[in-house]
Amino acid sequence: FDDEKWRPEVGDTEFFFFDRAFLENLVIAKYRLNQQDLTQDEFDILCKLAHGIASLMPPVDKYLYLDCSVSTIIEHMRQRGREYEDDLDLMYVYELKELYDEWAKTLPPERTLRINMDGGEYDLNEIVRFLEA
């Protein structure tokens, strides 16, 4: 397996955008570990695998963390109208939000813009300035 052929060459593009940071996926794995759906060994394997895959990806320059309350998350889920989200346990949403907040605290503050989405208003100019800096 030649991992070099999967890497984009420097200069191929000016901008990569991921709607999620790859390692953010470990938040779900951490939740599953807390629920005892994964053993510590399984979680450790997932972490090693995720970090290995992440090392093949372009490094993240900047993070936008969309933050909001659990009630806003629930409201957004209702607006999406996805059937499988209709019966989600409120405790699940609360615990997952706590884990995402823990993860966000590990991000480099100088490269992270935390945007409060409660109320639905945000300063687009602030976001653009952050991304262009």
Regions found by a protein language model. Give the residues of each.
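A structural motif corresponding to the C-terminal end of an alpha-helix
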Residues: 17, 52-61, 102-113
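ATP-dependent small-molecule kinase phosphotransfer cores
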Residues: 1-48
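Conserved nucleotide-binding/hydrolysis micro-motifs of P-loop NTPases
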Residues: 22-24, 68-73, 119-121
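A glycine- and Lys/Arg-enriched "phosphate-lid" helix/loop adjacent to the NTP-binding pocket
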Residues: 28-98
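Surface-exposed alpha-helical segments enriched in charged/polar residues
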Residues: 1, 5, 51, 98-105
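NTP-dependent small-molecule kinase module
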Residues: 74-133
